[in-house]
């Protein structure tokens, strides 16, 4: 995120990629894709037997959505306040899309999942989003916090429900990924069509478009934009 044409890095921080992969697609894997995909595959260890809910549909959340679909989760449910993002999630293959602002949101969610999601992944970096993820997780299920909030954001959870319902709450930093191990794996999934992250690329921009791009990102009007010097 330094917006530099070149960077000096130790070799341990580099991952060799197939020369056939366009740079504008490879660039997506440096943060958002590994965080979202890793949260589902590494942190939550989701399987085809799980129902997976993604709360927050930015670049990280939509990457998590693609991961859930790629592993064949029983159900993939997308949750966001933006109807445009929900429409994109549906296009990408989500089984259900829900807006928390809708009337009877929780009741509807619990109905379509028969009591809650096995796994709920929060990717918005919002205390409200994490609370929503916890509330829609079923008894014995796992809630993953993958979003990065401000240092003073706090939430209140029921101690009783954590204990009595045998809940699991896990943090996920960069998708619990080891770059040299996981990025080649995810790139292979991309090349074989299992992880179509290129569909998350909203536009390619030049340096002179940078401020407008940052505004779009701040207003949640874009998913991923790649700077081409």
Q: Which residue stretches match the model-derived regions?
A:
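Rossmann-fold dehydrogenase core element
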Residues: 142-144, 157-199
């Amino acid at each position: 995120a330094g917006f530099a044409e070149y960077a000096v890095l130790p070799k341990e921080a580099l991952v060799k990629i197939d020369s056939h992969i366009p740079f504008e697609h490879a660039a997506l894997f440096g943060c958002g894709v590994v965080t979202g995909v890793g949260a589902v595959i590494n942190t939550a260890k989701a399987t085809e037997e799980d129902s997976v809910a993604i709360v927050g549909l930015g670049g990280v959340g939509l990457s998590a959505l693609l991961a859930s679909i790629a592993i064949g989760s029983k159900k993939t449910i997308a949750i966001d306040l933006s109807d445009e993002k929900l429409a994109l999630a549906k296009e990408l293959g989500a089984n259900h899309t829900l807006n928390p602002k809708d009337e009877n949101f929780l009741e509807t969610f619990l109905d379509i999942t028969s009591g809650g999601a096995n796994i709920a992944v929060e990717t918005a970096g919002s205390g409200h989003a994490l609370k929503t993820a916890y509330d829609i997780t079923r008894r014995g299920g796992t809630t993953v916090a993958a979003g990065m909030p401000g240092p003073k954001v706090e939430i209140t959870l029921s101690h009783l429900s954590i204990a009595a319902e045998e809940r699991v709450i896990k943090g996920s930093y960069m998708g619990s990924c080891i770059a040299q191990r996981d990025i080649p794996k995810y790139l292979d999934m991309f090349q074989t069509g299992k992880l179509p992250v290129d569909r998350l690329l909203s536009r390619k921009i030049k340096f002179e478009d940078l401020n407008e791009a940052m505004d779009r990102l701040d207003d949640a009007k874009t998913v991923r934009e790649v700077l081409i010097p």
